[in-house]
């Protein structure tokens, strides 16, 4: 809800001459923003929006049936929240699907492992020896052809931080690791889940393969399973079987959903905020980005409840296909 004061100030403010090189927000606008902020902090609209989306729709992978239901849900929610105008814009994109995935250690220490395919990974079955690397840089430094027919495993352990700053390293492994593995001749790619948790649900996200490379199966191991694989690798060579039934399947069309509070004096000038409506398919997407949908819809709703409409138009967009786009 902390977006509300800034939105209101932007929609109500006037600027001084260019020579003064500064913008002054009128006291009346600041007072209204402060009042609105207190209302927002005491209001549960955002919470109810997130609860509704995650309960009634749940996971909503771009291009899926649930994604289509989410679009209809968002249109209805904007209207219920009192937005003046509600409309949709079509968005067409390649459609990636996850059907099944599994992995297992073979041989004397045979046991199952819990994985999830990375978004954009092709399907396939790989049975090969695992070669462990502590970091992405170590994999990138491996000589060309040195992992011919093997599975590259990047076992980078993210560090917990209040600002989540180490996530950029985890996401870099997801984004760049499969292509780095391909350059070494690897037949498959595994990474330790990008997170600092201890449950057996692996983190997913989009990966991309560099132009000119033939994609290989790529997956994320849960942190407990990555620990287990690392311990086994310390004992000696480990052979693993990874089977993914995933891949691109034509095109799909989803929609951006837009709700608008019309400005009273300068409706053609628009203050735009937004969040993405789609999520990955393994959870309800409450944080990524259900919370953003709740915050932005609620902000627009509360501004729309003011006795005086904002000077400029407030436009809230629930964007399609952010996760894979």
Show which residues each predicted segment covers.
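Acidic, glycine-rich active-site loops and adjacent beta-strand->loop/helix elements
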Residues: 157-159, 195-196, 277-279, 317-324
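Soluble metallo-hydrolase cores and metallopeptidase-like ectodomains found primarily
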Residues: 30-32, 106-144, 207-286, 298-301, ...
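Sec/Tat-exported extracytoplasmic proteins
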Residues: 40, 54-61, 74, 78-85, ...
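Structural recognition of the beta-strand scaffold that forms the well-ordered cores
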Residues: 49-54, 87-88, 130-132, 151-155, ...
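Bacterial N-terminal signal peptides
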Residues: 2-15
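Stable alpha-helical elements in mature extracytoplasmic
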Residues: 29-32, 45-50, 57, 66-74, ...
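Noncatalytic luminal/extracellular "stalk/propeptide" segments of secretory-pathway proteins
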Residues: 21-31, 35, 51, 55-163
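Extracellular/luminal Protease-associated
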Residues: 64, 114-217, 284, 288, ...
